[in-house]
A protein has these predicted regions:
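Bacterial Sec-dependent N-terminal signal peptides
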Residues: 1-29, 466, 470
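A non-transmembrane, solvent-exposed segment enriched in polar/low-complexity residues
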Residues: 20-177, 184-215
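Short solvent-exposed coil/turn linkers within tandem alpha-helical repeat scaffolds
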Residues: 175-180, 266, 306
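Structured, charged N-terminal subsegments at the starts of enzyme catalytic cores
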Residues: 206-273
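N-proximal helix/coil linker or "cap" segments that precede and/or mark the start of modular domains
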Residues: 282-338, 348-349, 400, 404
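Short active-site neighborhood of thiol/selenol oxidoreductases, capturing the structured segment around
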Residues: 345-374, 387-389
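Structural microenvironment flanking redox-active thiols in thiol-disulfide oxidoreductases
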Residues: 369-407, 420-426
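Thiol/disulfide oxidoreductase modules built on the thioredoxin-like
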Residues: 411, 421-462
Length: 470
């Protein structure tokens, strides 16, 4: 096979051209901006991260460049010291372009050279920016207006402007359906609901079910080009926090579904797995620690979540193992205790419709603040089948001081006990006080870590709910 000199020269220059076009090169000119540095940041999750900071060149421009292409997403040019940001799109195909604007009006005078995607993006933003103030004004007027002809007129005007925006949007997305700009813009859109029939309660339920079903219509979980936009995180967290039934089983299934979709992308999988692991490590809602245990067992112990710190991984796994026997729905660990008279008994031997176990200490500030509420709770619930068991968490030599504190403050009416060997401490993972567990007759945990101020209200609701479900 013969290769001519001309062909070799062509191949050489073609290869150099390809190499020259590899990576990214974004040149920025901001008229009136004379600061030494300009920063390029990107979205990921619910935060922005700095990609690079460059110095002003001799020509007054700022050039961001690198041999490895940028991952697609919404990036932000950040001016100092005001931290004013200018958003721009970076797609897989457009990594080399120029940006021009003015410091005094960075958004109004924003122009792009060599980036069709950003031209489309700005076209959409300008249109929406023009109509949004009008929509906001009409919505405010509609909200303030009393029922009548005036309100109906405002409603019609609102519908007309909204219809104009929607028509433009749908046409924009249709014409530019293959563009990255259209993908990003669509991901920012809220769900539009059909009209639902039925009672107000039925309409609310249908709306919620529709939102859950269509949550990822505009933000497909497998569309990883949207990872570096704020819309991806918003869709994922809205689905879990607002559109799932807030019960551990439902949340576990929902997070499993999300992570399964994200598996092909290691960065996304690790980020959201760790995000939810942290969220449910210290949940705000009682019983949701079961989600943490599930995630730790399913993804951490199996090695699917990659943590750079082995010690942290081991600690989280250990925490899950300690929490698992204490989850709501589990039978409370049986423990041997001694009452103030020296009589030994087992927790499971207590005969009562409900047992409230409080592990406390006389020198614990939080316990001291909570004790009056425990007393009030006991007085109101002692005749409703609730037994209060207070377990003093102190060494044997301090028990006399503990009992004196009980007597001096009038807390002796309910059952008090101790275990100088601290055998309960491991079983109930006592690393701080107070610890609170509500159990039913069979000593199944039905509530835990109930704050003293809300104890009467929460336990009354639990008891009432259990009565209805019988």
């Amino acid at each position: 096979m013969k290769i001519t000199l001309t062909a070799l020269v062509f191949l050489c220059f073609h290869t150099l051209g390809v190499l020259a076009n590899a990576g990214y090169n974004i040149k920025v000119n901001i008229e009136g901006y004379r600061e030494r540095k300009l920063t390029l940041a990107y979205y990921f999750g619910n935060q922005q991260y700095i990609k690079d900071t460059v110095k002003m060149g001799a020509d007054g421009a700022y050039t961001f460049s690198g041999q490895t292409p940028l991952l697609p997403g919404i990036y932000t040019l950040v001016m100092t010291p005001t931290n004013v940001g200018i958003d721009l799109l970076v797609s897989e195909k457009e990594q080399q372009f120029s940006v021009q604007t003015k410091k005094a009006s960075p958004h109004a005078d924003l122009k792009f050279i060599g980036s069709k995607e950003n031209e489309l993006f700005q076209q959409y933003i300008h249109f929406v920016s023009k109509h949004n103030p009008q929509l906001d004004t009409l919505r405010a007027q509609y909200k303030r207006s009393a029922e009548g002809p005036k309100k109906e007129k405002i409603k019609q005007a609102l519908q007309k402007v909204d219809s104009t925006v929607q028509q433009y949007l749908q046409e924009f997305l249709r014409v530019n359906k293959d563009s990255y700009a259209a993908l990003v813009i669509k991901s920012s859109l809220s769900i539009r609901y059909p009209s639902f029939s039925g009672t107000d309660e039925e309409k609310v339920l249908k709306t919620w079910l529709y939102a859950r079903k269509h949550c990822f219509d505009n933000v497909p979980l497998t569309e990883f080009r949207l990872l570096r936009t704020p819309h991806f995180y918003q869709a994922v967290t809205t689905y879990v926090n607002e559109l799932l039934f807030q019960h551990p089983d439902s949340i576990n299934a929902g997070i499993d579904y999300i992570l399964n979709q994200l598996r092909p992308n290691r960065e996304a999988f690790d980020y959201y797995a760790i995000h939810f692991l942290r969220q449910y490590l210290q949940p705000k809602v009682m019983g949701m620690d079961a989600v943490f245990v599930h995630l730790a067992e399913t993804y951490l112990e199996t090695g699917e979540i990659q943590l750079s710190n082995p010690a942290q991984k081991a600690k989280l796994i250990q925490m899950a193992q300690k929490l698992k026997p204490l989850l709501i729905g589990k039978i409370a660990p049986n423990i041997a205790l001694t009452d103030r008279a020296g009589k030994t008994f087992n927790l499971h031997d207590l005969e009562s419709e409900y047992t409230l176990l409080v592990i406390w200490a006389y020198d614990c500030g939080h316990c001291k603040q909570s004790a009056p509420f425990w007393k009030s709770f006991y007085e109101k619930f002692k005749d409703k089948g609730v037994k209060l068991l207070a377990l003093c968490h102190v060494p044997e030599k301090e028990l006399p001081t503990c009992w004196k504190y009980v007597d001096d403050n009038g807390y002796g009416a309910w059952l008090h006990a101790a275990d100088p060997l601290f055998r309960y401490a491991k079983a109930y993972n006592v690393e701080s006080t107070p610890q609170v567990y509500l159990m039913d007759r069979k000593k199944v945990i039905i509530g835990k870590q109930i704050v003293a101020e809300k104890m009467e209200e929460v336990i009354a609701q639990i008891i009432e709910l259990r009565k209805k479900n019988k």
